[in-house]
Regions:
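Conserved CoA-thioester-binding segment of acyl-CoA-metabolizing enzymes
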Residues: 1-66, 102
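An acidic, glycine-rich surface segment that forms the CoA-thioester-binding/catalytic face
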Residues: 41-56, 79-116, 159
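Terminal low-complexity tails and localization/encapsulation signals of metabolic enzymes
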Residues: 1-3, 263-276
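Terminal peptide-recognition signature
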Residues: 17, 46-47, 65, 78, ...
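Conserved hydrophobic/aromatic "anchor" residues
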Residues: 43-44, 51, 73, 265, ...
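Crotonase-fold acyl-CoA enzyme core
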Residues: 103-218
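Glycine- (often His-adjacent) and acidic-residue-rich active-site loop
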Residues: 21-33, 38-39, 67-100, 119
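C-terminal long alpha-helix characteristic of the crotonase
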Residues: 33, 135-140, 191-243, 256, ...
Length: 276
């Protein structure tokens, strides 16, 4: 096993970013299926680097974010780390984590979070910055229980959970510290899909499913523009969102892939997209 906090690999147009750490947020020194994958500033810096690496790789069309092992996607920030640093460090730690997750959220490539186990606290905050969340059945729960530590979910948790599931349920979930089953999370649109299978099957199925978003299967510029409209549009007035949508569409009409897609439809053949 690579002795890293964040493992990075690419396979057929997909970048796989894996969180991998012990309870203290240190790199794993041996195989551990129950690793909590807690994060420190060092792991968040490594995650930031991996996001930028995938963003600039023209051969990468889709990003898969997951955790090591079969028990946790991530248990969130290392409590041992938080207990040993100053309030000033904690503030900048949260600020940097916010910047990293915003970078993930704003990356034009589709980000799929493969929730292979519990995603709690900061672990759920990371998952919520992805575009699509898929969980492995019966492998864990999700929640933002920071209230039990006397704090709030300060890495985008209050902002993203409210936007994803609505104010009333998000507020209740955070002030009670409730941990939600994957089934309940799916019912509240926090999780897109729940798949059965062991950890190895789950990862294989995730990669197979994500292959549909790679070239030549999908027009990657169109995927990126759809994501940009969906991410940015809800934060601006509706008429501005419509204007943004028109401009994004206009740029696609001038792309080679739009010409290929329309021609393939007329000619009743499968389109061969190039990302141009």
């Amino acid at each position: 096993m690579p002795n890293k906090l964040v493992n990075y690999a690419t396979l057929d147009g997909i970048a796989v970013i894996e969180l991998s750490s012990d309870a203290a947020g240190a790199p794993l020194t041996e195989t551990n299926d129950r690793s909590p994958n807690t994060y420190t500033h060092e792991m968040m810096s490594d995650l930031d680097d991996a996001i930028i690496k995938a963003r600039f790789d023209d051969d990468v069309s889709c990003i898969v974010l997951t955790g090591n092992g079969s028990s946790f996607f991530s248990a969130g920030a290392s409590i041992q780390m938080l207990n040993s640093v100053t309030p000033g460090f904690k503030y900048n730690f949260c600020l940097h984590a916010n910047e990293t997750l915003s970078r993930l959220e704003q990356t034009s490539k589709l980000v799929v979070c493969a929730i292979n186990g519990h995603a709690v606290g900061g672990g759920l905050e990371i998952a919520m910055a992805a575009d699509i969340r898929i969980a492995r059945k019966n492998s864990g729960k999700v929640g933002l229980p920071e209230i039990n530590l006397g704090v709030l979910a300060g890495t985008g948790g209050t902002a993203r959970l409210t936007r994803l599931i609505g104010k009333a349920k998000a507020l209740e979930m955070m002030v009670t510290g409730e941990l939600m089953s994957f089934e309940d999370a799916h019912a509240h649109n926090l999780i897109n899909h729940i798949w059965e299978g062991d950890a190895a099957d789950f990862r294989r199925d995730i990669l197979d499913w994500c292959s549909q978003f790679t070239l030549p299967n999908k027009a990657t510029k169109a995927v990126g523009n759809i994501k940009r409209s969906c991410q940015t549009g809800p934060e601006i007035p509706f008429e501005y969102h419509l204007a943004l949508e028109r401009e994004l569409q206009a740029s696609l009409f001038n792309s080679s892939d739009a010409k290929e897609g329309i021609a393939a439809y007329v000619e009743k053949r499968v389109a061969n997209f190039t990302g141009q």
